[in-house]
Amino acid sequence: MTTAEDIRNRLMDLKDEEYKAFNSKLIPNVDESLVIGVRVPALRKLEKELRTEDLGDWLSDLPHKYLEENTLHGIVISNMKSQEDCLFRLEEFLPYIDNWASCDIMNPKVLAKDKERFLACIKSWIKSKHLYTSRFGMEMLMSYFLDDEFKVEYLELPATVKSEEYYLNMMIAWFFATALAKQWESAITYLEDNRLSKWTHNKTIQKAIESYRISPEQKEYLRGLKIK
């Protein structure tokens, strides 16, 4: 049985002080004393090494103390092969996520094997009052339901979320910028009709204009939709 102390010691062995200082600036809402300073490739390598070990107790030992423990936890969940185990561990972990990095690292592909069930979970997550649960739900909707599985009503899910939280509004902008690249005709109406908050509206336009997937003509049209 691999303990929390075992994993923490292995993370400490991967510590990079220079990276700690850099990463702390990117995640200002996490106290620097709670950042070890482990690069993501090293975390992914450690996760592979841990696949043969029993992590049950560690996964349930929440909340974790360090940023990298949370990020590693997210990587472990993302690589689970069982839908039931993955969903159980994900629901257990989501309420404890307190930063965008640990949130955005997660991509539990196994859940996409049952699209109907996955979508039901996504809808529930997006409606959550917990910032990073809602953000995660939007990211999963963006990643898995803007292509062949797309339905126009999916755009309503993030559009109806009203929040003052920076990291949630940034996710909404990211979602709609991606939707503009993949489903222009459906997504553009949300800007034309001013369906988003002013900040999110303008941030969506900014991110879309920065995208190589948006044509020059579309970018010019978007500039005309910016709210002064």
Where are the language model's segments positioned?
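Alpha-helical scaffold domains
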Residues: 1-228
